[in-house]
Amino acid sequence: MRIKLIAVGGKMPGWVEQGYNEYVKRMPRDMPLQLIEIPMPRRQKNADPHKLKIQEGESILQSLGSGDHVVALEVEGKSWSTPQLSQQMERWRMSGQDVALLVGGPDGLSDACRARANQQWSLSPLTLPHPLVRVLLAEQLYRAWTILQGHPYHRE
């Protein structure tokens, strides 16, 4: 099973790449975490945010495999504790499907992306900056994996 983080945006600060990559290299070979960056359309003064969101959504959907289990990261989604995330991860692994985690642009995910999603997950009721989301996701996925392995990284 591969986990794909499909995120709108690019050119992250060095601390983001360093933090994200630290957890990517810790993930097991049979459950790699792959980042797919979707270029963000230029946002000009007169640009229609709704059209930009649709355009971003089309690019995200093109990045998906037909058999991917899609999880949209949405504020309105279901929140999981870290142990619950590890249980989700085990279910994903048992399904044999690749998992695609979708992170929208500044205006969120398009309706088409939300409709394609098998699940909606809320990391927090707070609005989180996109760079921080990448690092947070990578760390939480690694932490969930360590729970499944009985590794002492996670403590309750």
UniProtKB/Swiss-Prot annotation:
The listed locations are: Cytoplasm
Matches recorded under Pfam families: SPOUT_MTase (PF02590)
Domain of life from the UniProt record: Bacteria
Query: What is catalysed by this protein?
Result: pseudouridine(1915) in 23S rRNA + S-adenosyl-L-methionine = N(3)-methylpseudouridine(1915) in 23S rRNA + S-adenosyl-L-homocysteine + H(+)
Q: Which residues bind S-adenosyl-L-methionine?
A: 73, 104, 123-128
- The keyword Methyltransferase is annotated on this UniProt entry: yes
Q: What is its main location?
A: cytoplasm
Which UniProt key words apply to this protein? Cytoplasm, Methyltransferase, rRNA processing, S-adenosyl-L-methionine, Transferase
Which residue ranges traverse the bilayer? none
Subunit (UniProt): Homodimer.
- Main function: Specifically methylates the pseudouridine at position 1915 (m3Psi1915) in 23S rRNA.
Q: Which PANTHER family does this UniProt record tie to the protein?
A: METHYLTRANSFERASE, RIBOSOMAL RNA LARGE SUBUNIT METHYLTRANSFERASE H
Q: What is this protein called?
A: Ribosomal RNA large subunit methyltransferase H
Organism of origin is: Hahella chejuensis (strain KCTC 2396)
